[in-house]
């Protein structure tokens, strides 16, 4: 008797796919001879996290005048120390022109990487599962502004079940910081726009302090608390301006966000506007099941802020630590939290340093380490086991330093709990690549059927 296969509904199929890859990866980990998935610790909780060695880092890279083909590109670096091409660029995929390549993020099933351009508002969708060593561009969204109703500057591309939530930085009316969130399906179809609350339109949210500016930047969620948080930066008129010119423009310096917004995750509605003055950027949430808090850092005031749930179940914001010497404006940029919620890595662009903070007590972070990474540094990504930290250099094309200080690199360091030790560095200018920005990890073990022959299970376990 033949059994008839019944095709499950799409949501169930998505769940089954995620479960299959999780189980496959766990099974591979038991073999001992294969790498299993490692993950950058600041990804969506809707994606499984498994300890192990990552095989690749995908670097979303800005094209640079006079360097190579001058186009934005996705650069794939081999980071598996057992590989013959360890520490080398093994693939590049140019997308045409300069779009102000910035951030990228996987879909929940990790099959596709979405990467945005802050200037052209294009979103490039790469297939990273068919051949993880050689991503393929499968779709370009070119009508983001029109579909969203005027949102400009697609920044964070963040995985929800079957969906991608995209934060905007600006709008097409005044190119200031007023903006919103834009939701798409994993297939790249527009769903809805959610505008960030302002003084003139709070949309039912409670304003708790002095600000309700409507600005946007990053997004993170804690599903168990039905929480979505967004932070705030600045609009197109600022982020596309020369950095020195902007610093000397008093009006421009007033156009920065000062808020973190609490949203109802499931209803997609704003609930509360928290004052976090000084341009709060990346949001990083704790992983512990009972750790109901997240961190952000403020670029202009050089502080670590804790966004936490109090004893009454209300969400609050509190400045808990200084970063370097705030009076010198070190310009905090990217941050990365360890998977055990004990360390927070904070990069500062102006002095090129990374700082490690002990956050065992989230209300009292203590700096325990610092290291100069380069003349400038922006992004940091930590492996799930906390042993590897990756760094890149570029902030924005018009904000990067000039002359010899305009170093463009991708670097790997090992962390032994006491010190960072550099393992390798790739000069993105020497390699004719451009300005290195966002990093995302890849691994063969996510897609067991696609393991190269020399790493196949049967070959090693007859």
Task: List each model region and its residues.
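Short coil/turn segments that connect the beta-strands within blades of beta-propeller domains
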Residues: 53-55, 109-111, 161-163, 224-226, ...
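Blade-loop segments of beta-propeller domains
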Residues: 86-156
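Asp-box/WD-like beta-propeller blade repeats and closely related beta-sheet repeat scaffolds
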Residues: 128-222
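Loop/turn-rich, solvent-exposed surfaces of beta-rich toroidal or solenoidal domains
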Residues: 302, 326-406
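Beta-strand-rich domains and repeat architectures in extracellular enzymes and scaffolds
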Residues: 39-79, 86-118
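Beta-propeller domains
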Residues: 107, 209-354
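Short, conserved, GDST-rich strand-edge loop motifs in beta-rich repeat architectures
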Residues: 52-69, 167-178, 231-255, 392-410
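Surface-exposed loop and turn segments in beta-propeller and other repeat-based domains
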Residues: 88-100, 138-150, 193-214, 270-279, ...
